[in-house]
Structure formats: structure tokens, C-alpha cells
């Protein structure tokens, strides 16, 4: 339901201009203190609006529409949706890699070459994390798919088959 509300705002800005870096606005909107200030009815709108002065006129006009439609509480999600549209246009695929131990530079380079081929991306944006509970192997999440080669999962499957 939330996506149905969020996406039209992101798509509207994207259709007008598809190369705006909304990362600073997204980071501001993810800050709970910033959002409390923005949603505080005792602070005049003019004071709140000064926070958006660094952004260009198009972004300010877009924010005005979001404000009038009372959707500022969804600003972080709207910005994230816009940034995803930009990534898609630019051929950037975000990949989340979880390993049992930190990967070496050589391992990450080899993995990124293979993943780039697999997903046919122009650019790969990899985010790595370590989870010792995996025991060994990797979990790779990209394009809505999960590739799980961890020993933890293999052991669970073995236990299921035995019982």
C-alpha cells in the first residue's frame, strides 16, 4: 500500500529530471529528529522551509506538492524510490553480500566480476557484511533474489531431510 503512495511522487520528479542527487535529502529525511522538527505543528512552515533552501527550485516545488498532500512523513521512502529509479536508469545493481568471515580484496574482486556477468550490470554497488552464524559460504541478495551457499542453510536442509 505504501509503495502505491510513494512511487508516483518519485516517478513525477524522475520524469521531470532524472539526474538529481537526492541523497542529502534522503539522509535528512531518515533522521528522526529532523522529521520530528518537520512534523512539529508549533514550528511555522516558513522556518521549516528554510531547511530546503539548499535544494534547487524544481526540488523545492516538488517538496511543496508533497507538503500540500500531507505526505512529508513518507519523504525518506519517496527519496529512496527516486534514487532506485536513478540506479536502474544508470544500470547500477545493488548487491548485498553476507559472508561468515571478511572477504579478502582478491575474493571481493573475483566475486564482483562474476556478479557483474550474472546480472549484466553496467555498474555494481556491493555492500558487504559479516555474519559468523553462516559458518562458511555466502548469502548474496540482488534483484530480489537470494543466492544462499552458506553452510548454515545446507546443514538445516540436511537436518530436514533426515527427520
UniProtKB/Swiss-Prot annotation:
SUPFAM superfamilies (alphabetical): N-terminal domain of the delta subunit of the F1F0-ATP synthase
How is this protein organized at the quaternary level?
Answer: F-type ATPases have 2 components, F(1) - the catalytic core - and F(0) - the membrane proton channel. F(1) has five subunits: alpha(3), beta(3), gamma(1), delta(1), epsilon(1). CF(0) has four main subunits: a(1), b(1), b'(1) and c(10-14). The alpha and beta chains form an alternating ring which encloses part of the gamma chain. F(1) is attached to F(0) by a central stalk formed by the gamma and epsilon chains, while a peripheral stalk is formed by the delta, b and b' chains.
Query: Where does this protein reside within or beyond the cell?
Result: Plastid, Chloroplast thylakoid membrane
User: What are the UniProt keywords, alphabetically?
Assistant: ATP synthesis, CF(1), Chloroplast, Hydrogen ion transport, Ion transport, Membrane, Plastid, Thylakoid, Transport
Q: Which GO terms describe its molecular function?
A: proton-transporting ATP synthase activity, rotational mechanism
For this record, the Gene Ontology CC terms, alphabetical, are: chloroplast thylakoid membrane; proton-transporting ATP synthase complex
What gene name does this entry carry? atpD
According to UniProt, the name of this protein is ATP synthase subunit delta, chloroplastic
Give the originating organism: Cyanidioschyzon merolae (strain NIES-3377 / 10D)
NCBIfam families membership = ATP_synt_delta (TIGR01145)
InterPro entries tied to this protein: ATP_synth_OSCP/delta_N_sf, ATPase_OSCP/dsu
**Family note:** Belongs to the ATPase delta chain family.
Main subcellular localization, coarse class? plastid
Gene3D superfamilies of this UniProt entry?
N-terminal domain of the delta subunit of the F1F0-ATP synthase
The function of this protein is: F(1)F(0) ATP synthase produces ATP from ADP in the presence of a proton or sodium gradient. F-type ATPases consist of two structural domains, F(1) containing the extramembraneous catalytic core and F(0) containing the membrane proton channel, linked together by a central stalk and a peripheral stalk. During catalysis, ATP synthesis in the catalytic domain of F(1) is coupled via a rotary mechanism of the central stalk subunits to proton translocation. This protein is part of the stalk that links CF(0) to CF(1). It either transmits conformational changes from CF(0) to CF(1) or is implicated in proton conduction.
A Pfam family in this protein? OSCP
Q: How does it sit in the membrane?
A: Peripheral membrane protein
Asked whether the keyword Magnesium is assigned, the reply is no
